[in-house]
Amino acid sequence: MSPGEKATILARVETLTWRKRKALAELGIARSSYYRWRRGRSGAKERKRPWNRITPNEERRMLAVAREFPDLSSRQLSALITDNEGFAVSESSGYRILRREGLVKRQETQVMAADEYHNKTRRPHQMWATDASYFRVVGWGYYYLVTVMDDYSRFILGCKLQKDMSANSLIEVVQEAVDATGMTDVPVEHRTRLLSDNGAGYVSRVFRDYLRLVGIGHILAAPFHSQTNGKVERYQQSLKREVNQLPYELPSQLERAIADFVEYYNYRRYHKALGNVTPADVLYGRREDILRRRKEVQAQTIIHRRQYNQALNTEPVNTAPS
């Protein structure tokens, strides 16, 4: 029963000079409820809305975005809405609404990159990380996806399916990253370093000679400790989780699926460790402007919600009997 209906019943019963008990019985209202309403304990008065409650229009728009992008978590959805919808919604508020509507994304189990390389990078291209992961193509056997990631921004600079893990196959992908970034045009003292595991191709003389030729230093991860290269390991887990949902009968099909994921990961996936911006935002120096704009949107949202909810709280409740 709404507060307005309770107020109407109170007004009607108060006009009776006798037989209030009978009137309440006919209305199906317990006497205890009637006297509790009179004391204002249960909401015969309109309950005040919290000043920061999300507005109905904001909730409708948030749910529309959630249904358009069903794979986004409440954290990613919060960032997407703040960047594109003109209002902000917190991760916790978004989660409560998504849970109520049955739209909560399944929690993913991920390997944390806490034990990453001990010297943390402070700028893009200070260090790259490389690793490989295998994929099966039906009727074609196994392929190795060799990846080069910028450690600071987590941007994927190069990746390619290779038939083996030979030094030349690895060099081909590293050269792709070198060409994309113009690394050989950078003064030698400012060029990147490359972090890799101790695989045979990476520790070979051919690979070492190549790195020396392009002026890139080489860092080997601690043996039997894959989390030293944890960022690229975690990326590969995310990639395989998405790409391996379907079998592939041609290498070109797998290449297309990988390319689509890399484009999404680099340019559209909000990364928690990066402040809920994309790797491209960090690589190209856009992160601080984005975070500043988000604070402005959040401040404007707070002002609007306060005004909206305070206006509702001051509206009079009609208690006159009809």
Model feature map: region roles:
Residues 17-19, 72, 249:
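Residue-level signal for the short linker/turn that defines the boundary of a DNA-recognition helix
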Residues 212-216, 237-322:
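C-terminal domain-tail junction helix/linker
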Residues 38-127, 283-290:
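Basic, flexible linker segments flanking DNA-binding modules
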Residues 5, 58-59, 73, 187, ...:
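N-terminal alpha-helical segment
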